[in-house]
Amino acid sequence: MFSINIEETAGCVVSAKVQANPLVTQKCHKEALKTVKKNVVLPGFRKGKAPDNIIEARYATQVEQELRRFLLRASFEALSQMCDRKPLSPKAVRSSTVDSCNAADGGVVSFLYEAFPVIPSLPWEQLNLSDPEPVKEISDEDLENGLKNVAYFFATKTPVTRPSQEGDFISLSLHVSKKGDLNSNPVAIFENKYFKISEEDMTDAFKARFLNVSTGHRVEEEIASEDIQSFLNGDLLTFTVNAVIEISSPEMDDEKARQLQAESLEDLKKKLRIQLENQAKEEHHQKRFSAAEDALAQLIDFDLPQSLLQEREEILSREKLLNARLVKYCSDSELEEQKQTLLEEAKADARKAVKLLFLTQKVFSEKELSISREELQRMMDVCSRERFGAHPPKDISNEMLQELVLAARDRLTYHKAIEAISAEKKDLEVVPS
């Protein structure tokens, strides 16, 4: 019923001509007549019951439009099901044109779209996944620092009027606005966010700004970077110190340990050590997971869809530049010096991310991995909380539910594929698909 001819170019761009035989256009013609009938009323006939010949004679233009619409839809379905180079999605179609369409003779439809990439057979023997470092051993210093963090639970937090000192916490708000624009209302980037004034928690530049300042202190900074101006839709940053808070932590003892469901201070230390050991194991596992990601991404190269690369690169570029300016607190001149490096990092990270998106799908299929209903439901709950918060709406639409299912399935597919590589770093035997 259909024949398809394609031409491929770089960036996974495909041009296709879909030829439909008369059986297809005849069926589309019947659907077109049926659709037009439903929308018109003729004297002497009930709605939708007028003879076809009368409808075709009086509404030839509308019938032709519907015929082309149905042919276009049928041709895209054929392209998605029959063609080796399937479109990524309906949104991946850059253009579609009905070149010819006749109920008796058939029709031709042209498409220009981005297709799924072609991934060669994976050379597992070349997988280079090095042995990770052993799990970190918990030292007495680690345990002592952990106890200090636990002591914060009992700390006295006192707002003070004196200037801020090393070790204090400050509550900050950050707003962006347009300088000199009286109609520009400041927009919050964050409000009442707490920072500890210390070398461990602040960059030197950020710490210098907020050491020896009092409640109510304001810092205004003009943004010279056009990139940051564009991202934030403003050119003036205003930091406001809402409070300076002195923290006084007591020494831990048996009584305080019992308040934390421990029998004694020694028992609390044992439980804390177990917790720190579990954290170290999780960090070790994450390092191994990241190493597997790197190894898979480096295993093979192939052509990638340009639009996905560009979209991911734009997102990562924005994140890296904003992080440098607002988190690492680089000046505009420092940001300009680092900009090219950051953009190159974003480009490389984007390529890696898009490669892994498709490689993990291939690994999932070749390794014959599966997702249980329980796993899918748990991941859907995670995706739902990320999108809606703790209380999702009760009347979620079918479309939104489908989005959650796809998001959850994609995450699980990615995670399971990387875990499979991490668990089997040597002698991976995969049956090619």
Curated annotation (Swiss-Prot):
It is an enzyme of class 5 (isomerase). The keyword Transmembrane does not apply. Keywords: Cell cycle, Cell division, Chaperone, Cytoplasm, Isomerase, Rotamase. The keyword Chaperone applies. Its main location: cytoplasm. It comes from the Bacteria. Its EC number is 5.2.1.8. One of its GO terms (cellular component) is cytoplasm. It catalyses: [protein]-peptidylproline (omega=180) = [protein]-peptidylproline (omega=0). SUPFAM superfamilies: Triger factor/SurA peptide-binding domain-like, Trigger factor ribosome-binding domain. It is found in: Cytoplasm. Residues 167-250 form the PPIase FKBP-type domain. Pfam families: Trigger_C, Trigger_N. GO terms for biological process: cell division; protein folding; protein transport. Involved in protein export. Acts as a chaperone by maintaining the newly synthesized protein in an open conformation. Functions as a peptidyl-prolyl cis-trans isomerase. HAMAP family: Trigger_factor_Tig (MF_00303). Belongs to the FKBP-type PPIase family. Tig subfamily. This is Trigger factor.
